[in-house]
Amino acid sequence: MARIASVNIPDNKRLVVSLTYIYGLGSTMAAEICNKAKISRDKKVKVLTDQELIRLRNIIENEYKVEGDLRREVTLNIKKKKDIRCYQGLRHIRKLPVRGQNTHSNARTRKGKAIAIAGKKKTVK
């Protein structure tokens, strides 16, 4: 397995698909990286030469924010929004959907498990 940006990418898949295993790289960015490195997208990772792998590593490390750096940046952005107490920050604090989704009947994933509300107990006559 080739190792790029501290991620083992699968050998038996096409290069453009393998690059999407790296956090922060989607199919569009993967195709863009292949074009910059002048490597065919359809080439399998196991047939890449060492020079091609080095070229890929250099492009990804120098021009893109991926893996730990990107995760850290996202976390810091969320923390900043919480600190300034803007609307999105408040939604994060309350663990509710941030981007305007409905919460009346949906958003179970974000809100957590449903909690039953105790109603009046029926009396037997």
From Swiss-Prot:
Domain of life: Bacteria
Transmembrane region(s): none
GO cellular component: cytosol; small ribosomal subunit
Keyword rRNA processing among record annotations: no
A single MF term (Gene Ontology): structural constituent of ribosome
Residues of the signal peptide: none
GO biological process, one term: translation
Record keyword Lyase present: no
UniProt keyword list: Ribonucleoprotein, Ribosomal protein, RNA-binding, rRNA-binding, tRNA-binding
Family: Belongs to the universal ribosomal protein uS13 family.
Oligomeric form and interacting partners: Part of the 30S ribosomal subunit. Forms a loose heterodimer with protein S19. Forms two bridges to the 50S subunit in the 70S ribosome.
Annotated function: Located at the top of the head of the 30S subunit, it contacts several helices of the 16S rRNA. In the 70S ribosome it contacts the 23S rRNA (bridge B1a) and protein L5 of the 50S subunit (bridge B1b), connecting the 2 subunits; these bridges are implicated in subunit movement. Contacts the tRNAs in the A and P-sites.
UniProt-recorded name of the protein: Small ribosomal subunit protein uS13
Source species of the chain: Rickettsia typhi (strain ATCC VR-144 / Wilmington)
Species classification: Bacteria, Pseudomonadati, Pseudomonadota, Alphaproteobacteria, Rickettsiales
Gene it is expressed from: rpsM
